A protein has these predicted regions:
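Active-/binding-site microenvironments in catalytic and ligand-binding cores
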Residues: 1-275
């Protein structure tokens, strides 16, 4: 059976979400076929972007001195990882500052089974699905005069994860924590405790993830593929998820069709040589 794969990341562009004090992606179009008379002219661009742009992965070094940087996170930690999705979107709909609690995670486990060790635990708040296309709505800093002492920015209001919940999933063996908001600490926090808890225990965090309703609580796998920049504490990433039962398998009919197509192509090439 062909695999149904879901892209859980957002397209990276000049309008992508990033931390408010950072610069957005900047693009320099070096040349195009239309602007070059050189033979074999091609499109070529250069980009400048913040490591925390759009859907991205935080390595331990993002907050932890001496912590691992992006290139030191192994493929085994990122590829074919069991996905566990904890949905608190109904509570966030009533309270933009809601933090997923340990009780929420425990209730999810009672309903769907224990979160397997080694999972990437995703907290679905519904925030990105509803607001990602508009930075102002996504940051939700409703009062510019209300300045957050910790960030020095107008206080943002978006959901996150409680420290107790983060500690609980890491204690349970979670490989990483993902969320569909700007960060798992929520719109305002004193000292980014969730970052320190998760990254301080040598796990990773994925932020600004698309966690649509098609993702079930259990039974899917994921691969997170950050841009592998040496020494980087964070990097933009692709994030794919698919049902575990498919395992990217293809049917015998598809194999046979590919084999027949290859034989026909070889025969056609032989006829051209002999002509």
């Amino acid at each position: 059976m062909a695999c149904r794969c879901v892209d859980c990341g957002f397209v990276l562009s000049e309008s992508s979400v990033h931390w408010p004090t950072c610069k957005p992606l900047a693009r320099n179009v070096i040349k195009t076929p239309e602007t070059s008379e050189a033979p074999g002219a091609r499109n070529k661009q250069a980009f400048t972007l913040n490591g925390g742009s759009g859907t991205h992965l935080d390595a331990p070094a993002h907050f932890i001195p001496g912590g691992r940087t992006i290139e030191l996170i192994t493929p085994q930690e990122l590829v074919n990882v069991s996905l566990a999705v904890v949905d608190v979107s109904d509570k966030v709909a009533r309270d933009a500052d809601y933090r997923c609690s340990r009780a929420d995670v425990e209730n999810d486990e009672r309903a769907h089974g224990a979160i397997p060790a080694g999972s990437l635990v995703c907290i679905r708040t519904g925030w990105a699905e509803a607001r990602y296309g508009n930075r102002s709505d996504y940051y939700n800093a409703v009062d510019a005069s209300d300045v957050d002492d910790y960030t020095g920015l107008p206080r943002m209001h978006f959901p996150g994860v409680s420290l107790d919940a983060a500690r609980y999933v890491v204690d349970g063996g979670a490989r990483g924590l993902a969320i569909d908001t700007l960060n798992p600490d929520g719109g305002f926090s004193d000292g980014s405790p969730v970052h320190h808890e998760v990254l301080g225990r040598d796990r990773y965090i994925v932020e600004n993830v698309r966690l649509g309703p098609e993702l079930p609580a259990r039974g899917w796998l994921a691969t997170v593929a950050p841009l592998c920049v040496a020494g980087a504490p964070e990097a933009p990433a692709r994030f794919f998820a698919w049902p575990a039962a498919t395992h990217w398998s293809i049917g015998l009919e598809e194999v046979a069709e590919a084999a027949v197509a290859g034989i026909k192509a070889a025969q056609a090439k032989k006829r051209r040589r002999e002509a």
